[in-house]
């Protein structure tokens, strides 16, 4: 029996066909898993974010350190009791000390208006003459030849019952010698002789004196003559003190008015009319006496108060006699000296505040050096502190100011850091985002 004939397989069918075992052995492709992909992405994002945060933290501004101000209680000093005379008027100052009274005076009493000043006017005469005819250091100035005209001035002064000193035609004195005769015995005739010598006439002097006074703001002082004998020659107590300050600052006149006496060739011994010289530190300046002015004294003195040297200038006018005036000024002086006090602005290394950083470091704001101020009279001292905002601080760095107010006058003192606040570093920055970024 013939078997059924199978259809012939084409070569393609043979080659292309796959048996079941072969098919089972072929590898299978896997589809990506979504969760794995997400994990990789998140990891990359976290790494990137961490790097960005770290970079931001490393470069971010640090928080400002907390500043605390150390409060300083105010200081109050009571006014002293000054023993002014019961008559006349007066004022007193201390060179370089701002006083509480008008014009920076320490104290004053009586009239503040214009008053006759007698021979205190010779302070103006001497200063104005020297402004026109200065005496060079180490010299005695020009030589002045006196004539019969000067003898006439002497006779006129005698007739007016004014103070005089001898003069003769042909007498020659240096300018320094002539000024000595003017100031010590208060010679009226020498006041006119010097004024005419320097300015050509009394009128020329009066015009120059007016200009000189105006240039110094002394508008309350009026000179109607060279000696002060005229009642129209007036000033205020405040301006008389200023004139005294100008005189003691002059290198020619200050030594002259401090001399008790002097021997002048052709004139003789001249005595200083200021009997207080050498008492209570008094070393000047000028007496004055007229019926209208009474007995007057413009005085200066050197004292040591609160361990410091102080020069004071004062004036008292209107006394009945010079002995009474001298006694009253001697009573006055210690009561004025008692009114000085030293006010401490800052002590060396005094704490006025502190800084504390968010990471626990601290520094103190302190004054670098001790500073003090000499004051007189009723005084109120208050202190205010201004600390600069800082993140880090170097030792010795200026960090603020303490303003010490003394009777309305501010005295600023810089504050410096005692201690160091440093950058806390990368570790603190990356672990304290709340402090760093708020």
Question: Which sequence ranges carry the predicted segments?
Answer:
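Terminal targeting segments of Actinobacterial cell-envelope proteins
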Residues: 1-36
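Active-site-adjacent loops and short helices of periplasmic peptidoglycan-processing enzymes
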Residues: 4, 56-238, 245-251
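Conserved SxxK-family serine transpeptidase/carboxypeptidase catalytic domain
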Residues: 5-8, 54-62, 77-78, 339-438
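Hydrophobic membrane-insertion alpha-helices, especially the h-region
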Residues: 38-53
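Short Gly/Pro-enriched turn/cap motifs at secondary-structure boundaries
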Residues: 80-82, 170, 287-291, 391-393
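Solvent-exposed coil/turn segments that connect beta secondary-structure elements
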Residues: 95-97, 131-133, 147-151, 197-199, ...
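Acidic/histidine-enriched alpha-helical segments
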Residues: 252-266, 344-357
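A penicillin-recognizing enzyme superfamily signal
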Residues: 254-340
């Amino acid at each position: 029996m013939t078997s059924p004939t199978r259809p012939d397989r084409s070569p393609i069918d043979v080659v292309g066909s796959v048996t079941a075992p072969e098919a089972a052995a072929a590898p299978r492709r896997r589809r990506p898993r979504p969760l794995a992909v997400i994990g990789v992405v998140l990891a990359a994002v976290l790494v990137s974010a961490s790097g960005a945060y770290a970079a931001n933290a490393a470069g971010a501004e640090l928080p400002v350190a907390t500043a605390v101000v150390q409060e300083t209680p105010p200081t109050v000093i009571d006014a002293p009791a000054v023993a002014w005379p019961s008559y006349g008027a007066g004022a007193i100052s201390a060179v370089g000390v701002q006083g509480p009274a008008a014009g920076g005076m320490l104290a004053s009493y009586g009239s503040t208006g214009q008053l006759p000043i007698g021979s205190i006017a010779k302070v103006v005469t001497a200063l104005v003459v020297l402004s026109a005819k200065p005496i060079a250091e180490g010299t005695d100035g020009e030589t002045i030849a006196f004539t019969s005209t000067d003898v006439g001035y002497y006779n006129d002064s005698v007739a007016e019952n004014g103070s005089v000193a001898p003069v003769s035609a042909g007498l020659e004195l240096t300018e320094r010698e002539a000024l000595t005769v003017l100031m010590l015995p208060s010679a009226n005739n020498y006041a006119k002789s010097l004024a005419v010598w320097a300015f050509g006439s009394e009128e020329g002097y009066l015009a120059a004196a007016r200009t000189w006074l105006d240039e110094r703001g002394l508008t309350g002082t009026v000179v109607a003559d060279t000696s002060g004998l005229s009642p129209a020659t007036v000033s205020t107590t405040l301006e008389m003190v200023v004139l005294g300050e100008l005189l003691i600052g002059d290198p020619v006149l200050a030594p002259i008015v401090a001399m008790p006496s002097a021997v002048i060739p052709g004139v003789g011994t001249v005595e200083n009319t200021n009997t207080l010289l050498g008492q209570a530190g008094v070393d000047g300046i000028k007496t004055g006496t007229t019926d209208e002015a009474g007995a007057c004294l413009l005085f200066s003195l050197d004292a040591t108060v609160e361990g410091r040297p102080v020069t004071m200038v004062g004036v008292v006018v209107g006394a009945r006699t010079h002995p009474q005036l001298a006694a009253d000024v001697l009573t006055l002086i210690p009561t004025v000296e008692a009114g000085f006090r030293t006010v401490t602005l800052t002590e060396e290394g005094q704490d006025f505040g502190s800084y504390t950083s968010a990471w626990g470091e601290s520094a103190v704001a302190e004054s670098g050096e001790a500073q003090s101020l000499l004051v007189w009279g009723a005084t109120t001292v208050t202190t205010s502190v201004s600390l600069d905002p800082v993140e880090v601080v170097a030792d010795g760095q200026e960090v603020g100011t303490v303003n010490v107010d003394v009777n309305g006058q501010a005295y600023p003192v810089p504050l410096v850091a005692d201690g160091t606040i440093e950058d806390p570093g990368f570790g603190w920055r990356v672990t304290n985002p709340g402090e760093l970024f708020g």
